Curated annotation (Swiss-Prot):
Tissues expressing this chain: Expressed by the venom gland.
Name the UniProt record assigns to this protein: Tetrapandin-1
Entry keyword annotation includes Secreted: yes
Organism of provenance: Pandinus imperator
Compartments it resides in: Secreted
Length: 4
């Protein structure tokens, strides 16, 4: 999971 990537967040940014």
């Amino acid at each position: 999971l990537w967040s940014g």
